[in-house]
């Protein structure tokens, strides 16, 4: 089977590695010549191989769709880790040409556009928002929901994710933070409004509000607050199923939230200054870790799961926690698992739609493949 990976930067490289390890022939395409040329150097495989079997550099972004069309007869799944501004057109092209498609997502308007078209004309499964948050944490929350489903109504679904410096390095700056992904994206998530489900009603809250203390089984005392993007369609999905409360929060070491909130709101620093604080003041992570927590409650029953991913000699924790989940789902898509399939889901038979949701992911197989990729090593 063949996987076409669009965008071979940090995340695309990790996706290519994962798909190769899952037994796929991997074709990598990028519009950035430097990224494509550096890709083989980013992953030190034991046998000297590169993480993708073929590389193509497209100098003109408008030629991306031509490249996809050229490979469409041999490709079993297309995985996009392209920037937001390139994703929509590429996804529409894949849908119109009957290709299985998935992406890291994160932009609500772009994902809505892709899914709306897929509902109208898709002939193969389409799955957006499949990174870490949104992505893995939402799948984990669905696992909890389905574990407790039946009898009385589920009341609360809480999702939390933290990309953190390794604890041994967590006191190197006052914010107790390091950059493991886009600082611009981080600032947007802190500043943008968020949607939550509260007492059965969808509400809008400010990013960085809702500060609470969290006792992690793996990392001890942390804090959490609302940030945008990570919930994806889980809020609306849980409301439709009668859940009272559902939210997504970001996890940080204690003290981070109050300090950043002071800089953003009280000092009213502009984005350029905030970017400089994060990049130059905190710096990029030498060693990082990602913690993923999902908690589901009903009556006196609680389902809670924590996952901890650490960086290794090959990838950062953020790369593994973002790229390995989408690769796992993409491998199932490529194998035809979601094609015209009826499964027993939440107590009854259900034909899987072509626009897939987190509830459609088979949790046992998903978790098994994550372990095959060595996500916890």
Language-model segment annotations:
Residues 32-35, 108:
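Helix N-cap at the beta1-alpha1 junction of Rossmann-like dinucleotide-binding domains, i.e.
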């Amino acid at each position: 089977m063949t996987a076409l990976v669009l965008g071979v930067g940090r995340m695309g490289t990790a996706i290519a590695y994962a798909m190769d390890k899952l037994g796929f022939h991997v074709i990598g395409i990028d519009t950035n010549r430097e990224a494509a040329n550096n890709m083989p150097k980013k992953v030190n495989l034991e046998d000297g191989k590169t993480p993708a079997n073929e590389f193509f550099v497209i100098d003109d972004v408008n030629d991306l769709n031509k490249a996809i069309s050229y490979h469409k007869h041999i490709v079993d799944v297309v995985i996009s880790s392209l920037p937001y501004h390139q994703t929509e057109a590429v996804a529409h092209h894949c849908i119109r040409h009957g290709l299985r498609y998935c992406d890291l997502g994160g932009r609500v308007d772009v994902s809505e556009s892709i899914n709306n078209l897929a509902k109208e004309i898709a002939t193969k499964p389409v799955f957006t928002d499949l990174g870490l948050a949104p992505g893995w944490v939402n799948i984990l929350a669905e696992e909890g929901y389905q574990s407790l489903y039946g009898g009385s109504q589920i009341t609360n679904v809480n999702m939390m994710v933290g990309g953190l410096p390794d604890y041994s390095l967590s006191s190197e700056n006052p914010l107790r933070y390091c950059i493991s992904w886009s600082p611009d994206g981080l600032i947007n998530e802190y500043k943008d409004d968020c949607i939550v489900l509260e007492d059965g009603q969808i509400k809008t809250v400010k990013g960085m509000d809702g500060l609470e203390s969290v006792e992690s089984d793996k990392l001890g005392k942390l804090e959490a607050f609302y940030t945008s993007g990570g919930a994806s369609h889980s809020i609306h999905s849980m409301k439709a199923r009668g859940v009272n409360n559902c939210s997504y929060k970001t996890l940080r070491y204690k003290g981070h939230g109050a300090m950043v909130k002071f800089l953003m709101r009280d000092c009213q620093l502009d984005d350029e200054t905030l970017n400089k604080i994060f990049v130059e003041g905190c710096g990029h992570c030498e060693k990082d870790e990602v913690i993923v927590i999902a908690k589901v409650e009903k009556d006196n029953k609680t389902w809670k799961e924590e996952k901890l991913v650490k960086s290794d000699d090959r990838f950062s924790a953020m790369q593994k926690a973002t790229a390995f989940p989408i690769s796992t789902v993409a491998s199932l898509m490529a194998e035809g698992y979601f094609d015209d399939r009826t499964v027993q889901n939440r107590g009854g038979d259900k034909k899987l739609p072509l626009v897939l949701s987190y509830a459609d992911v088979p949790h046992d197989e998903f978790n098994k493949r994550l372990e095959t990729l060595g996500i916890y090593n």
